[in-house]
Amino acid sequence: MNFDMSKLMQQAQKMQEQMKKAQQERENMEVIGESGAGLVTVTMTGKYDVKSVSIDNSLMSEDKEILEDLIAAAVNSAVKKVEENSTASSDIYKMAKDAGIDLPSGINFPFK
């Protein structure tokens, strides 16, 4: 079995480019988290920056604690969506396979 260092380096570079692209896509994405059947919505970027919060006028007469809970739930919903989309777009095994690298299953990487 011949070991081709230049081929390995090309594969590693391709994988690095794919990971960089996935990171850029994540940073540019926006998700919307909601609570109270859509009465509270939070728009968040892939960098976890909250861009906007929308509260339906019908909630303005609600108790302060209820409103705080709904806002927290909407933020948590948005965070969960960012994480779900990040995991899907940066699957290390898929990137490695696309780069022609066969990784053994069961490796626990310190990142996603």
From Swiss-Prot:
Q: Where is the composition biased (Basic and acidic residues)?
A: 17-27
| A GO molecular-function annotation | DNA binding
Sequence intervals crossing the membrane: none
Gene3D superfamilies for the chain: Nucleoid-associated protein YbaB-like domain (3.30.1310.10)
Family assignment from sequence similarity:
Belongs to the YbaB/EbfC family.
Protein name, per record: Nucleoid-associated protein FTT_0810c
Q: HAMAP family this protein is in?
A: DNA_YbaB_EbfC
UniProt subcellular location: Cytoplasm, Nucleoid
Using the UniProt annotation, give all residue ranges assigned to the region (Disordered): 1-27
InterPro entries registered for this protein in UniProt: YbaB-like_sf, YbaB/EbfC
Give the source species: Francisella tularensis subsp. tularensis (strain SCHU S4 / Schu 4)
Functional note = Binds to DNA and alters its conformation. May be involved in regulation of gene expression, nucleoid organization and DNA protection.
The answer on whether this UniProt entry bears the keyword Metal-binding reads no
Q: Which domain of life is it from?
A: Bacteria
Q: Identify the keywords attached in UniProt to this record, alphabetized.
A: Cytoplasm, DNA-binding
Gene Ontology CC? bacterial nucleoid; cytosol
Q: Which PANTHER family match?
A: NUCLEOID-ASSOCIATED PROTEIN YBAB
Instruction: Please give one Pfam family short name.
Output: YbaB_DNA_bd
